[in-house]
């Protein structure tokens, strides 16, 4: 799949790349993004103003889309569900992404 990726720290440093489609783990879902917003966080990331961003990274944490695949322990949504996300304010704090401070994943 194609993604606009922040490849390294610093201003711009973005590339349109072909990346592997993720496979959801037991407690994760894969969302096909239909709409996304560009907010201040993304602009600061684009400009290289956040030193905590771990690259490579696909920017964008405000989005909506359709659940394309679910992990085996997911019970609250089904494949085909329409979902939205804003991960900055409410994260589980337990999954691998949260432990790695990759809250947007």
Regions found by a protein language model. Name each.
Residues 11-15, 40-41:
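Short N-terminal binding/cap micro-motifs at the start of the first secondary-structure element
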Residues 1-2:
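Extreme N-terminal starter segment of soluble prokaryotic enzymes
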């Amino acid at each position: 799949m194609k993604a606009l990726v922040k490849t390294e720290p610093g201003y711009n440093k973005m590339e349109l790349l072909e990346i592997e489609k993720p496979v959801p783990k037991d407690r994760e879902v894969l969302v096909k993004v239909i709409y996304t917003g560009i907010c201040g966080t993304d602009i600061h990331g684009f400009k290289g103003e956040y030193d905590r961003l771990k690259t490579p990274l696909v920017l964008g944490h405000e989005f909506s889309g359709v659940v394309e695949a679910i992990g085996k322990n997911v019970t609250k949504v089904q494949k085909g569900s329409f979902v939205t996300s804003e991960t900055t304010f409410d994260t589980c704090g337990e999954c691998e992404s949260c432990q790695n401070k990759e809250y947007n994943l």
